[in-house]
């Protein structure tokens, strides 16, 4: 089971002059996408008992995602106000004292033996206590489980850039795979080109650094020659959840190829990487073709 640990929230998405509440969150979207693609998936994050919490749980159940590690709480659900400019999403978060933000280490029980990989990232890595809790989870299990991290950096959400950079500096060496957008790479290394920035991240310890660039497609920076997979053409409705779905496609491909182990990732080949990037791009193309974070089901994917 691929365990996705990180935020779920309600995206307040513009709709006919008002806002429509949609369940979302970077790591949550990846969990939903993995479940819809047919992968054995678990989710770890506190879920509020408010009506929005019930709205968050329904798509997880529909996608077959295991939520046994999701504690219920009376704290309120995080809200993200979404604004769209030419289909590009920007977010304002209402998160103080929310259900997810207050995740503590004691809220997480022992991981079941069925967990075979760990995915984490998003805004859940920024504030405490939840950021420290996710960091501790990764620190506890990274020696045994392959770890993929997508920080999905939101500069406007970061109140202490130094502390956040320090957390990422601790997390990236524990990860086997790190996914970063061009914006993420610029924030991390503003004086470097995107590829040099990706190689700087690779030098900290991951075996793969995946760089996404929208229409430019995706690249994998690793010990071998750079692997590139072109973007899949799509009529873009909006980009909400595109990167999250890409992550799910990559993980699903690695799982199907029998590569979701630390040893297998360390010995991965260019062809295997290309297959993973391609499935990620194909899945993301479906998501951007429709409004909101609505990743594809397995039957909607190319044969």
PLM ranges: what are they?
Residues 1-66:
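Glycine-rich phosphate/adenosyl-contacting loop at the front of the ribokinase-like
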Residues 8, 26, 123, 151, ...:
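Active-site metal-binding loops of divalent metal-dependent hydrolases
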Residues 10, 14, 49, 153-155, ...:
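Short, glycine/acidic-enriched loop or turn micro-motifs at the edges of active sites
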Residues 34, 181, 243:
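Short, conserved phosphate/pyrophosphate- and ester-handling motifs at nucleotide-, phospho-/glycolipid
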Residues 40-123, 147, 303:
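Conserved N-terminal subdomain of the carbohydrate kinase-like
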Residues 117, 123-199, 206, 216-217:
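Conserved beta-alpha-beta core of the PfkB/ribokinase-like small-molecule kinase fold
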Residues 190-303:
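Conserved phosphate-binding/catalytic region of the ribokinase-like
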